[in-house]
């Protein structure tokens, strides 16, 4: 198990993502995300960060009316795969290669433009330093009163292997009211992986719904 401040090196994703060998490439959307779709959570301008091969974004696009979806990943290869899958599914998604801990002003992502931001297994790959940069970029991207959805491995997952675990106490500190956020809910969930993954098919996770304040 990664320690509290461990990050997953970017080189790992460049060598693995989009090849079919990533344990997160299950070729279907995460069940936790499909349930949110059924609840009507996604609307307006949606940004899927770390979209990988696109299964969550494509599912949202196919099963949600009147949404405009942008999906990003650090690595070009899974974006290529995701574009092909979206075309075959006849779902219109804008795909971008973006490093979410870099300067976003040089990208096509627009400030305060997104009603809903989805993060399925991104936050838990960052070091403490990098996740502060990441949160600043979330604040740059999200609309006032926008919703940030995070699905990441939780402290309740005690099996060895995989990225760092996210502590509920850290979420409340990082996404505090003083920082311009309100945590609406943190629920136990499952992050599904392939059987080749160190945590098997059912990594214990938190599904967090976090609201940006209307005025910050």
PLM ranges: what are they?
Residues 1-47, 53-109, 126-140, 146-216:
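Class I (Rossmann-like) S-adenosyl-L-methionine-dependent methyltransferase catalytic domain
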Residues 117-118:
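Hydrophobic beta-strand segment of the Class I
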Residues 121-125:
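Short catalytic micro-motifs in class I SAM-dependent methyltransferases
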